[in-house]
């Protein structure tokens, strides 16, 4: 019993505080986003699916900002939250891009650039952390701008339909192209920052 109480005190605040619960909700929203388009439901037309998918993505994106803000405000920053938050973000974006590719709303090149970058830089950050050099590839303003543009472009492409005279597909396509360019530039920057460690590791082998 003492061991069980100790385990509960340690794990409950870490795994189930409010910021982490918001992050878990963002992860749970991902299969819901997929189901909107893949589960047959005759009562839903394309517009309804687009609207629901857009709302889900926007709500999930809001939790991305909210969980970090709450963690800092409430003093509930945890290692689990620091790990889950970027994982949830990348999963959400990558799944949305795959769905948009399947719907024919973006081209494969854009999806490959953005998804490839997320996988590459995530792996790079983990490796840099393992050798004590994570600060060299910490998120900077370029990464934040890239993320902001992605989070604006994807809802437009999910909604797809025009809003009055505003063509969501047209402007969403331009913005996701801009995001892909920013993605490539930020990847090159992070690889350059990590190059001394990468070169040293290669030399050691």
Q: Model segments located where?
A:
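Alpha-helical transmembrane bundles and membrane-interface segments of multipass inner-membrane proteins
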Residues: 4-205
């Amino acid at each position: 019993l003492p061991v069980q109480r100790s385990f509960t005190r340690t794990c409950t605040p870490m795994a189930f505080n409010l910021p982490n619960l918001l992050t878990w909700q963002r992860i749970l929203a991902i299969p819901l986003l997929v189901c909107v388009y893949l589960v047959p439901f005759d009562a839903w037309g394309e517009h309804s699916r687009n609207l629901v998918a857009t709302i889900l993505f926007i709500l999930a994106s809001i939790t991305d900002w909210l969980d970090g803000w709450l963690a800092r405000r409430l003093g509930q920053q945890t290692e689990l939250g620091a790990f889950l938050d970027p994982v949830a973000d990348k999963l959400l974006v990558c799944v949305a891009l795959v769905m948009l590719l399947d719907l024919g709303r973006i081209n494969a090149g854009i999806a490959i650039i953005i998804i490839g970058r997320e996988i590459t830089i995530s792996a790079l950050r983990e490796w840099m952390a393992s050798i004590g050099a994570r600060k060299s590839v910490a998120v900077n303003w370029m990464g934040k701008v890239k993320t902001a543009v992605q989070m604006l472009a994807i809802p437009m492409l999910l909604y797809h339909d025009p809003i009055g005279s505003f063509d969501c597909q047209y402007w969403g396509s331009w913005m996701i192209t801009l995001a892909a360019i920013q993605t490539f530039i930020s990847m090159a920057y992070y690889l350059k920052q990590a190059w001394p460690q990468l070169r040293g590791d290669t030399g050691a082998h």
